[in-house]
Amino acid sequence: MRRLFAISSTGNRFVHRSLLGKGKCGTAPPSFSHCSFWVRDFSGVRYDYRKISINRLNDLKLDDAVNLFGDMVKSRPFPSIVEFSKLLSAIAKMNKFDLVISLGEQMQNLGISHNLYTYSILINCFCRRSQLSLALAVLAKMMKLGYEPDIVTLNSLLNGFCHGNRISDAVSLVGQMVEMGYQPDSFTFNTLIHGLFRHNRASEAVALVDRMVVKGCQPDLVTYGIVVNGLCKRGDIDLALSLLKKMEQGKIEPGVVIYNTIIDALCNYKNVNDALNLFTEMDNKGIRPNVVTYNSLIRCLCNYGRWSDASRLLSDMIERKINPNVVTFSALIDAFVKEGKLVEAEKLYDEMIKRSIDPDIFTYSSLINGFCMHDRLDEAKHMFELMISKDCFPNVVTYNTLIKGFCKAKRVDEGMELFREMSQRGLVGNTVTYTTLIHGFFQARECDNAQIVFKQMVSDGVLPDIMTYSILLDGLCNNGKVETALVVFEYLQRSKMEPDIYTYNIMIEGMCKAGKVEDGWDLFCSLSLKGVKPNVVTYTTMMSGFCRKGLKEEADALFREMKEEGPLPDSGTYNTLIRAHLRDGDKAASAELIREMRSCRFVGDASTIGLVTNMLHDGRLDKSFLKMLS
């Protein structure tokens, strides 16, 4: 196999003294013919490399740069290595690192010797490709040839260590650089600080800022920006704020980016008032906020339901000629939709269009959700079709929103059509998609179709969650398929998924309504053993089951237990027992329960009042009962 650089077994003293030896410098890197770019002939504009300035090189397109390289290697004599260095540097700035490596190999094969600068470019490219062992091999080769790496080369290697999860080696490299007489610059320190934050070594990163000063390298705006960003991501906002004061004391103006970072962090950690105060502070200091500043604050205010404050900020930024963007409008539209203020959301959408700001998927999805919430399904569908016509393609969340809207409106067949359309577009439905459809079919009394969707969900490899199972069990029980529900419930109990009290309530109610009161009671009694605490619905459901079976004494006993040990009875509990005693002709117990219910500030519900009214007509009750309930 061909080799790009032959490495001597002795190497250079620098390589052997440093951690660079960890990169297996004793092994030459293989040929890079596997790289994804090759020099090809292009029929583009022809360039004379002798007449191209550095500025023009930076303006070259990739195809033209490769074409120019082809012309250079055909020239005799070859252009100087300086000309090749300029071209390789320009291509590296396009982030075409594989191509630079491939061209470097071709230069060597043609006998064009590399110099310090081209070696440095190649090392940087290998580091950017996360091929540290090859970068170290090139470094060893250049040092064997007598080239001492400069600070730029070592910074490239340092960056490679930081991004290659070798942060300890990066720290050691900086220490060895100092020992060997190299003066780390701000890029060195900034790279290492960023790397330390990436590897959760924040205290070392902050301490390094003070070390910079000791080493005669003043932290710059970039340094502080990296540290502030790292601290804010960790939630160390107080430390970030103290660093802000330190900057001002050091006569370094923080700038809008650093303020934005802290304001956004304060918003994320729900310190909205502190964020607004910092916003005022930066404004008073003459640091002009930008659209990013406003977006953070508007989003946060919307999350807190402070619509008027958010709207005022929008007006303020427009007055100051700071143009809101799609993020600004989308945040406000989504917030207004969630608050039920669809008219305001539509006005913002119209304003957005008037300003020639194209809505994104988030904007469209929010409005579709709003239309669905207000049962304006035709408009929701129109908005859905509009976004597709604008080449803004819906994602799973958008589809789920519209499917839910159709299912809620008992138009489940249209929801199913959307589900099929999803598949045709290559989108895979998630747990929410399938659960929504299952619920929709049950609401439409299409029990068989609901079960078919559940089976398809399982066969498609989409895992049902506890909500899916609860909806399935509830639908089966309500459609008289309790035996099927029991089979599903038994499977659920054997699985690793833990049913919640909502699921247990469904099964207890289903059993009781199907006449399996004893089974319902057994399940009720087993809850404490399972570590599940019955709630007021559980107790009321079980009492209702007892009453339906004529077991009034058991219902009363459970009611007493509930008042002593369980959750406090609610209106539903009292009304259930009142009706049971009235049907049984026990007027005294009914009257006592009504008085107790009224003392708890509950009133009779429609079913109880209806029963009392009918019994009044039949002469089985006097009007005093109706007065007690009123």
UniProtKB/Swiss-Prot annotation:
Transit peptide: 1-22
One matching Pfam family: PPR_2
Location in or out of the cell: Mitochondrion
Family per record: Belongs to the PPR family. P subfamily.
Keywords from the named record: Mitochondrion, Repeat, Transit peptide
InterPro entries named among the record's database cross-references: Mito_RNA_Proc_CCM1, Pentatricopeptide_rpt, TPR-like_helical_dom_sf
PPR repeats: 80-114, 115-149, 150-184, 185-219, 220-254, 255-289, 290-324, 325-359, 360-394, 395-429, 430-464, 465-499, 500-534, 535-569, 570-604
Stated name of the protein: Pentatricopeptide repeat-containing protein At1g63130, mitochondrial
GO cellular component, as recorded: mitochondrion
The keyword Disulfide bond is annotated on this UniProt entry: no
SUPFAM superfamilies cross-referenced by the UniProt entry: HCP-like (SSF81901)
Lineage: Eukaryota, Viridiplantae, Streptophyta, Embryophyta, Tracheophyta
Protein's UniProt keywords contain Lipoprotein: no
Species name: Arabidopsis thaliana (Mouse-ear cress)
